[in-house]
């Protein structure tokens, strides 16, 4: 099939207007409007003007029909819109605009220097006038850490968006301006949803590693998230000025631990406190930073003698690694020729965008060294919006997969990826994948088909806003006045498209909570509603049995932050109970059942009989209900009631009242009564059969096992291992570095409560740890017995009341 052309479609470049330019545009519009009115009133000029106007609108209609034809062809056969076809056939003006846009995120392990690096990026691009440190003495804090809590604790809690322009010289020495949409993300696993939703809408990422620690636990998590959303990345080895810095250890760990081909594109000139700059391996030039804040770059062909041999060796390793992932370089390599600088650069770009390779840069953000070359790498090696494949599902065509085209003239498709409460109401962050989002326009929410107006569009600079009139394809913005949920798709109504949302992990820890003062009930409810809306991993439930409100999250720190925010932002002090683990229940073995529910009470009674079996599914994933009725002994509507009863039973297990995992129920026979059978009767019969069969199946209580990583100075290794053994942890691996060691272990969440204070005591405050949910496994028999007895006592006490 012939590839449909996208050329010649009219295009409107994205409006990144400042307030002054917006006012000027408005004045020009009024001037043109007055002039056009005068023309229309003129008897001699009106016909000519009307003819031109008619021709203009005809061109617009033709463009729209062409765009519609392109979409129609793509919907019928998505392969017609390959990324190559999109890039080749874009209108030159539109292609030029998109080629200068980069949507990137910065992600890494805790304290690898993400926010510090972002601060330098903003300074070197001219977005901010002065550098402020994360834990600076000036009490200002980094620009992207806008929350008071972030500045006090020195950590990033929520992702923050900004935009800036970076000027880079092309091959001919001409300066080209590139537009960057940048999102800084947290490093703590407790705030992993912030990383998830950022990577869901970004085209590329900078993965930062510590030059001393290399690949750490959260680096592996970030790598998994990048793979989930097919996000190309470049790597930046930060903290080259730290004692024990070894960037090539980090490169080796990317290859071995993350299993992605990687090679250095720079080598350091000096290290630790003698780190001076880097050597660019493509151009074989030494690069140094000068000026009070490293704002001036100095390049020279004179590479220091002490690193010449290393630079030659690493350049050859770069070419060899590329030969394994890129056909063009492989051919050159086999012919024993030397690729040119441009050939290497293009190969790195191809391999990076195709997720086959990551180039590794190095520097020190805190020391203001070698950040600008990393920015050049963002431009050179990360994709623009037209080079990334973004898919939507067409609900009008049985959810057929359709490629989205980052073209301003096509119908609008956008994804709401983050909600935030502000002084002006709900702020919704949207990535526009296709078409143009305009102020005052109407859009449709694909989830509920609601039509909403866009009253205001802003571009975010951390907690500051800049109003704009429109945002084009490939851009990120925020809008006010749009009620929606995180992950909702918006269209202009012409398309039935919906996009997949981001992955949301299940909470692993809960707390009972209530306001200390009953007068704070209204503010307490407002806070709970807002926090749930903003953060999908923060859950609020009400336990009818204990009559308690429970909040659930990703860890102790996660819930502590929300309790502190409630106190500061809503002036509500809360009482909390002890942490509660998200236990699960599961079936032990296959059990058959034949249950009859029969009640007579004078009038219509209840009658339902269900026959079948329950068995483990083989994995602790979703529960399965299956009907194998032959001969219609149970009608379809009663089977729906049986399925409902099964899922209700799985939501609250018979052992300790927690959710059930890995259970399958099959109903293959039953009986009904002409007058006494009902949907309610079959639902209740199924629940009763479930409870009885479950208890006969040798069931078990499951507890969450956490993947735990502890890092501390080497002299405390024995104390740390003893601390973990005391908590029944299974130690899987350990690494001993120059000054510190790392222990990798699996430990039950129940055993990890309160470890922070004990670890600080054991390591004189120098140890740190991270936890991430790994899997569920059977709890120890004594713990199962205690939990079941406690639950049964609570049930008995409740019935006495």
UniProtKB/Swiss-Prot annotation:
Localization: Mitochondrion
Domain tr-type G: 99-386
Pathway the protein takes part in: Protein biosynthesis; polypeptide chain elongation
Keywords assigned: Elongation factor, GTP-binding, Mitochondrion, Nucleotide-binding, Protein biosynthesis, Transit peptide
NCBIfam families (alphabetical): EF-G, PRK12740.1-5, small_GTP
Cell cycle found in the keyword field: no
GO biological process, one term: mitochondrial translational elongation
Binding site for GTP: 108-115, 184-188, 238-241
Listed name of the protein: Elongation factor G, mitochondrial
Upper lineage: Eukaryota, Fungi, Dikarya, Ascomycota, Pezizomycotina
Nucleotide-binding in keyword set: yes
Native source species: Aspergillus niger (strain ATCC MYA-4892 / CBS 513.88 / FGSC A1513)
Function as written in the Swiss-Prot or TrEMBL entry: Mitochondrial GTPase that catalyzes the GTP-dependent ribosomal translocation step during translation elongation. During this step, the ribosome changes from the pre-translocational (PRE) to the post-translocational (POST) state as the newly formed A-site-bound peptidyl-tRNA and P-site-bound deacylated tRNA move to the P and E sites, respectively. Catalyzes the coordinated movement of the two tRNA molecules, the mRNA and conformational changes in the ribosome.
Stored CDD domains: EF-G, EFG_III, EFG_mtEFG1_IV, mtEFG1_II_like
An MF annotation (GO) of this entry: GTP binding
Top-rank lineage group of the source organism: Eukaryota
Stretch forming the transit peptide: 1-62
InterPro entries assigned: EFG_II, EFG_III, EFG_III/V, EFG_IV, EFG_V-like, EFTu-like_2, G_TR_CS, P-loop_NTPase
PROSITE patterns cross-referenced by the UniProt entry: G_TR_1 (PS00301), G_TR_2 (PS51722)
SMART domains linked to this entry: EFG_C, EFG_IV
CC annotations in GO: mitochondrion
Family: Belongs to the TRAFAC class translation factor GTPase superfamily. Classic translation factor GTPase family. EF-G/EF-2 subfamily.
């Amino acid at each position: 099939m012939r590839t449909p052309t996208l050329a010649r479609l009219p295009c409107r470049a994205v409006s990144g207007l400042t307030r002054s330019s917006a006012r000027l545009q408005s004045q020009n519009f009024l001037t043109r409007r007055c002039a056009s009115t005068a023309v229309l009133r003129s008897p001699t000029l009106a016909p000519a003007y009307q003819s031109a106007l008619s021709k203009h609108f005809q061109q617009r209609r033709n463009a729209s029909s062409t765009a519609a034809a392109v979409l129609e062809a793509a919907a019928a056969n998505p392969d017609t819109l390959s990324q190559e076809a999109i890039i080749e056939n874009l209108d030159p003006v539109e292609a030029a605009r998109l080629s200068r846009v980069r949507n990137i995120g910065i992600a890494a392990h805790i304290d690898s220097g993400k926010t510090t690096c972002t601060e330098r990026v903003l300074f070197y691009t001219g977005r901010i006038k002065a550098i402020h440190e994360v834990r600076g003495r000036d009490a200002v804090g980094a620009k992207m850490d806008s929350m008071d809590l972030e500045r006090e604790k020195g950590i990033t809690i929520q992702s923050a968006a900004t935009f800036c322009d970076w000027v880079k010289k092309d091959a001919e020495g001409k300066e080209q301006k590139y537009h960057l949409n940048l999102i800084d993300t947290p490093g703590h696993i407790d705030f992993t949803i912030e990383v998830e939703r950022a990577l869901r809408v970004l085209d590329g990422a900078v993965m930062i590693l510590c030059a001393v620690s290399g690949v750490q636990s959260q680096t592996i998590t970030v790598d998994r998230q990048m793979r989930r959303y097919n996000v190309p990345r470049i790597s930046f080895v930060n903290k080259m000025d730290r004692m024990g810095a070894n960037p090539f250890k980090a490169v080796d760990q990317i290859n071995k631990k993350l299993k992605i081909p990687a090679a250095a594109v720079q080598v350091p000139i000096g290290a630790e406190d003698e780190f001076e700059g880097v050597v660019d391996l493509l151009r074989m030039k030494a690069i140094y930073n000068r000026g009070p804040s490293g704002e001036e770059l100095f390049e020279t062909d004179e590479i220091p003698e002490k690193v010449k041999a290393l630079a030659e060796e690493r350049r050859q390793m770069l070419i060899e690694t590329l030969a394994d992932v890129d056909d063009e370089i492989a051919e050159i390599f086999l012919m024993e020729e030397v690729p040119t600088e441009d050939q290497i650069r293009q190969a790195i770009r191809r391999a990076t965008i195709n997720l086959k390779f990551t180039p590794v840069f190095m520097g020190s953000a805190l020391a203001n060294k070698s950040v600008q070359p990393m920015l050049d790498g963002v431009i050179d090696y990360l994709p623009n919006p037209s080079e990334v494949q973004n898919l939507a599902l067409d609900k009008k065509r049985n959810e057929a997969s359709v490629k989205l085209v980052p073209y301003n003239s096509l119908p609008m498709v956008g994804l709401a990826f983050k909600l935030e409460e502000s002084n002006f109401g709900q702020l919704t962050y949207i990535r526009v994948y296709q078409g143009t989002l305009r102020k005052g326009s109407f859009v449709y929410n694909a989830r509920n088909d609601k039509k909403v107006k866009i009253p205001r569009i802003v571009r975010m600079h951390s907690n500051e806003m800049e109003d704009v009139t429109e945002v084009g394809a490939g851009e990120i913005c925020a809008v006010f006045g749009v009620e929606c949920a995180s992950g909702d798709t918006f269209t202009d109504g012409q398309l039935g498209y919906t996009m997949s949302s981001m992955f949301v992990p299940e909470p692993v820890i809960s707390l009972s909570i209530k306001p200390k003062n009953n007068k704070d009930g209204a503010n307490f409810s407002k806070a709970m509603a807002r926090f749930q809306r903003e953060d999908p991993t923060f859950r609020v439930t009400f336990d009818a049995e204990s009559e308690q409100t429970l909040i659930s999250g990703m860890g102790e720190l996660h819930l502590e932050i929300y309790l502190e925010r409630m106190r500061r932002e809503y002036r509500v002090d809360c009482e909390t109970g002890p942490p509660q683990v998200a236990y699960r229940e599961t079936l032990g073995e296959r059990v058959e059942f034949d249950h009859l529910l029969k009640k007579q009470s004078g009038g219509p009674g209840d009658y339902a009989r269900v026959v079948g079996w329950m068995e483990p599914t083989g994995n602790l994933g979703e529960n399965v209900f299956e009907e194998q009725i032959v001969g219609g002994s149970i009608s379809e509507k009663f089977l729906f009631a049986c399925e409902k009863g099964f899922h209700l039973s799985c939501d609250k297990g018979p052992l300790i009242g927690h959710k059930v995992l890995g259970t399958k129920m099959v109903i293959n026979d039953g009986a009904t009564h002409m007058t006494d059978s009902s949907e309610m009767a079959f639902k209740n019969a199924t629940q009763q059969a479930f409870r009885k069969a479950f208890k006969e199946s040798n069931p078990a209580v499951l507890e969450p096992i956490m993947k735990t990583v502890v890092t501390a100075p080497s002299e405390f290794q024995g104390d740390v291992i003893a601390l973990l053994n005391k908590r029944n942890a299974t130690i899987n691996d350990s690494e001993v570095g120059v000054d510190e060691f790392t222990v990798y272990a699996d430990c039950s969440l129940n055993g990890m409560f309160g470890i922070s204070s004990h670890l600080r005591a054991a390591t004189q405050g120098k140890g740190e740890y991270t936890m991430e949910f790994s899997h569920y496994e059977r709890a120890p028999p004594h713990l199962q017995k205690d939990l079941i007895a406690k639950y049964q006592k609570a049930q008995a006490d409740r019935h006495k009341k």
